[in-house]
């Protein structure tokens, strides 16, 4: 699911959610200073996802959805430290999931990871990690680097349909540098299939992003190199024992002579 512009919330007393909805960040900071408890209050946001799906959220979820600046995120965390660990009700996503889904500034992602690094390991109701959403929304390379540095094993984790972050990246389109980051993290993912049998190459072939053609070419070359390397290793494994046996034979002959 992707983020949509959500409608006005139905909580008349929730001043902070209203201010966040209007992206009035100066007033948001003032409200947090005057009434820090507002950061702990949940509100029902109609159309929070895709403009259709309603969810019960905290102010920090709202702020991440609207790409709030780092200062706002840090203030909300200080007002309610546990809030960064809480999940919205529709898809059980943390603030980091939502920030990656909306292509939030790298400064915001850095703050979220700093305060709650474990969020990089949390799967939502669809089995997706924050990195799945980062790969789906063409985030800056720095965001992908940060997520991989914090949790390298994320490259090996599939969602409920068996999609690794690489499958998502290939389907939606990323730069070759980002593609290399994912492959370097988990080389075997190049040949990993989704539950329905799609390889990363097949996902790239179905894509229509501006990176489409170069991604397909890169993956084809990468797979060929991998296959050749495997053949070379097999040839070496076969050749090496034979060479040793030949050496032993010549030594035995020499000893008898």
Language model segments and positions:
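Start-of-repeat signature of ankyrin repeats
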Residues: 12, 56, 91-92, 127, ...
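Conserved ankyrin/ankyrin-like repeat signature
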Residues: 27, 71-72, 107-108, 142-143, ...
């Amino acid at each position: 699911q992707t983020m949509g512009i959500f409608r006005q919330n139905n909580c008349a007393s929730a001043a902070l959610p209203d201010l966040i909805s209007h992206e009035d960040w100066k007033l948001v900071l003032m409200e947090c200073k005057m009434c820090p408890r507002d950061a702990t209050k949940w509100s029902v946001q109609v159309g929070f996802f895709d403009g259709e799906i309603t969810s019960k959220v905290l102010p920090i979820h709202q702020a991440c959805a609207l790409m709030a600046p780092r200062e706002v995120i840090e203030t909300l965390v200080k007002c309610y430290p546990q809030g960064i660990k809480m999940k919205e009700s529709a898809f059980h996503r943390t603030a980091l999931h939502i920030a990656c889904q909306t292509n939030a500034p790298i400064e915001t992602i850095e703050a979220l990871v700093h305060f709650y690094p474990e969020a990089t390991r949390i799967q939502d109701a669809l089995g997706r990690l924050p990195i799945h959403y980062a790969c789906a929304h063409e985030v800056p390379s720095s965001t992908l680097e940060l997520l991989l540095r914090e949790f390298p094993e994320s490259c090996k984790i599939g969602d409920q349909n068996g999609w690794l972050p690489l499958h998502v990246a290939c389907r939606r389109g990323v730069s070759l540098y980002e593609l290399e980051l994912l492959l370097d993290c988990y080389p075997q993912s190049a040949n990993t299939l989704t539950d329905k049998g799609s390889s990363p190459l097949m996902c790239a072939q179905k894509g229509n992003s501006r990176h489409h053609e170069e991604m397909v070419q890169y993956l084809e070359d990468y797979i060929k190199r991998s296959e050749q390397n495997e053949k070379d290793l097999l040839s070496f494994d076969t050749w090496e024992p034979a060479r040793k046996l030949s050496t032993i034979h010549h030594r035995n002959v020499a000893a008898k002579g």
